[in-house]
């Protein structure tokens, strides 16, 4: 069984978060937040194996320019407590080689692009020297708004904020879909390992039947 880890978090201006800073840190960029004048230089940080911007078909070319896009993403949010982006972090199987992990990371990013019509920064990180050497993972930073031919539009991913359990169901579904993509890539690589998106408790209950 391969390691499965997939979590989602939100970034809010109310907490002092900036999507420009988040993008710079995750991809090892040197970005200037034009709304604050603050620079975020992580170009010398280690551990970033690969990065790429993804956007829906027909999106303007500037959506693939991290400096321009994430500043546009910030400018689109005017409220002091606005959510400026979301992130999905996913473990990448150590059973795959570096190229296979990059291809998988792009496939996961494309899943989010097509499902939610957002732009996504894909940033693959390698294990830290002193950490678990199986800890390959990808950060998938998602725009707060949908992206179309005209650029940034209406707010995206409202299903994750739904009440009465709707948000939990939406998160459970995307975790399941992520596991499906990972397992397809493991199978294509000729590896017998698989991931399971369910909790350890749910897996144990099924095994006990």
What are these model-derived regions, one by one?
Residues 1-209:
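N-terminal nicking endonuclease/strand-transfer module with a His-rich metal-binding environment
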């Amino acid at each position: 069984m391969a390691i499965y880890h997939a979590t989602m978090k939100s970034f809010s201006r109310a907490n002092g978060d900036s999507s420009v800073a988040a993008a710079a840190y995750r991809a090892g960029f040197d970005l200037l937040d034009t709304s604050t004048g603050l620079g975020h230089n992580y170009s010398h940080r280690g551990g970033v194996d690969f990065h790429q911007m993804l956007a829906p078909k027909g999106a303007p070319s500037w959506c693939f320019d991290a400096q321009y896009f994430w500043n546009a993403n910030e400018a689109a949010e005017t409220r002091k407590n606005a959510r400026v982006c979301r992130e999905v972090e996913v473990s990448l199987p150590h059973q795959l080689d570096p190229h296979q992990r990059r291809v998988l990371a792009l496939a996961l990013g494309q899943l989010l692009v097509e499902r939610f019509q957002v732009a996504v920064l894909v940033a693959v990180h390698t294990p830290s020297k002193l950490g678990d050497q199986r800890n390959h993972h990808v950060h998938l930073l998602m725009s707060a708004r949908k992206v179309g031919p005209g650029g940034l539009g209406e707010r995206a991913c409202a299903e994750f904020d739904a009440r009465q359990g709707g948000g939990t169901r939406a998160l459970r579904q995307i975790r399941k879909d992520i596991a499906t993509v990972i397992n397809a890539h493991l199978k294509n690589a000729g590896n017998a390992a698989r991931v399971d998106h369910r909790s350890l408790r749910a897996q144990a209950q099924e095994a006990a039947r």
